Amino acid sequence: MSESVFADRIVQNLLDTDFYKLTMMQAVLHNYPNVEVEWEFRCRNSEDLRPYLAEIRFQVERLAELSLSADQLSFLERISFLKPDFLRFLGLFRFNLRYLHTGIENGELFIRLRGPWLHVILFEVPLLAIVSEVRNRYRYRETVLEQAREQLYRKFDWLTANASAEELSQLQVADFGTRRRFSYRVQEEVVNVLKHDFPGRFVGTSNVHLSRELDMKPLGTMAHEWIMAHQQLGPRLIDSQIAALDCWVREYRGLLGIALTDCITTDAFLGDFDLFFAKLFDGLRHDSGDPVLWGEKCIAHYHKLGIDPMSKTLVFSDSLTLPKSLEIFRALRGRINVSFGIGTNLTCDIPGVEPMSIVLKMTACNGQPVAKISDEPGKTHCKDPNFVAYLRHVFQVPAVSSLSSKE
């Protein structure tokens, strides 16, 4: 009998999330325990999600049942930079549903979060995973696990046929696919197959629960929300990125050193990423715009600062596939270290299935708007066009980024 792709519970436990939510949560506990934030859900495909509201609400209510077990806490205790006070807090943590609002507005599903950053930060990944899987249960209920497995092995065959043994030995790939996965069981199977059969170097997953299950190190550092929040936390807007990086450095003392560049734009980021930060951080993460142009720009920045790019790593995570990863790898190989975090194309690539394009983004911090502009016009996110205009003015951001792939 074929194995079902759907488990009874969509979100398995509190660790069924991306690792960077925990690393940011610790930094919030230590630095911003009283900051209030707002988040909003957006579906980028024109898809009617209203029929799924009741089931989404049911699954969301089950989040409130989750808490960390002694074994799960003991796994986190082995991660040296997670501090005892944070782990004690996590041991007591429960999802508080009073901060979450769902319903229908203007003919569309809405999901909003409003509350203390410390208490809403963990909602994002499980909420997106719930929306994705609930929708897939309705639309693709006949799907079986074998379809996902076969599709993954077809990708391995392509990679083996198109990359040399030497290239494969250096091609580092990680799973970043929790939030838009087809289902938990599909992600579990994909990560298990990657660990045992990937022809390149599988370096791990961002999913903390699956890292624990497969005895691997969870991967991740920071997300856009960390830099976005500082737009309303720092003394001056122009200093907001520096404030975000400074706070991260104080929290982690050189650990977790991959910085995200495109919250405003990479040009604006590199203007703040001076010799101090460039020496201290291990590398940079790409999440929008032309990846090879971005890589060239980062290499040039390190050279300008007198830093050997081969001592640094670039992590790519923007809508990647294995062919796209191989193309980027070949373009930059031997000049800087590269690694690839692949999400939807691993955990929601099944023949006949259309993956969702959904996000849940911070829209306000302490009652004031925050924004992500990014290196790609379609990825700008802000409720307040006046604030976006002000942000562009302060950081001298042109209408089209120098890294936009849509030029």
Swiss-Prot record:
The modification Phosphohistidine is found at residue 224. It catalyses: nicotinate + 5-phospho-alpha-D-ribose 1-diphosphate + ATP + H2O = nicotinate beta-D-ribonucleotide + ADP + phosphate + diphosphate. GO terms for molecular function: nicotinate phosphoribosyltransferase activity. Pathway: Cofactor biosynthesis; NAD(+) biosynthesis; nicotinate D-ribonucleotide from nicotinate: step 1/1. Keywords: Ligase, Phosphoprotein, Pyridine nucleotide biosynthesis. GO terms for cellular component: cytosol. Transiently phosphorylated on a His residue during the reaction cycle. Phosphorylation strongly increases the affinity for substrates and increases the rate of nicotinate D-ribonucleotide production. Dephosphorylation regenerates the low-affinity form of the enzyme, leading to product release. It holds the Pfam family NAPRTase. It is an enzyme of class 6 (ligase). The keyword Phosphoprotein applies. InterPro entries: N/Namide_PRibTrfase, NAPRTase_N, Nic_PRibTrfase, Nic_PRibTrfase-Fam, Nicotinate_pribotase-like_C. NCBIfam families: NAPRTase, PRK05321.1. Catalyzes the synthesis of beta-nicotinate D-ribonucleotide from nicotinate and 5-phospho-D-ribose 1-phosphate at the expense of ATP. Belongs to the NAPRTase family. This is Nicotinate phosphoribosyltransferase. The gene is pncB.
